[in-house]
Amino acid sequence: RKGWFKAMKSIAKFIAKEKLKEHL
C-alpha cells in the first residue's frame, strides 16, 4: 500500500511538471 501511495505522488509530481512546462 505504501508503494502505491508513493507512485501516486510521483505521478502527481510528473503531471505538475508537465503543466508548468505548458505555462512557460
Curated annotation (Swiss-Prot):
Chain's role: Antimicrobial peptide that inhibits many reference strains of bacteria and fungi. Is potent against Candida species and multidrug-resistant Acinetobacter baumannii (MDRAB). Is probably localized in the cytoplasm after being transported through the cell wall and membrane. Is able to interact with cell membranes and enter into cell plasma to activate the mitochondrial death pathway to sensitize cancer cells for apoptosis, as well as up-regulates p27 to inhibit cell proliferation. It shows very low effect on normal cells, such as erythrocytes, Hek293t cells.
Tagged with keyword Cytoplasm: no
Species, as recorded: Lycosa singoriensis (Wolf spider)
Key words, A-Z: Antibiotic, Antimicrobial, Fungicide, Hypotensive agent, Membrane, Secreted, Target cell membrane, Target membrane, Vasoactive
GO (cellular component) term, any one: other organism cell membrane
Name of the protein described by the UniProt record: Lycosin-I
Subunit note: Monomer in solution. Small size oligomers on the lipid membranes.
Family: Belongs to the cationic peptide 04 (cupiennin) family. 05 subfamily.
Uses: When conjugated to gold nanoparticles (LGNPs) or gold nanorods (LGNRs), this peptide has great potential in cancer-targeting delivery and photothermal therapy.
Record localization: Secreted; Target cell membrane
GO BP terms, alphabetized: blood vessel diameter maintenance; defense response to bacterium; defense response to fungus; killing of cells of another organism; regulation of blood pressure
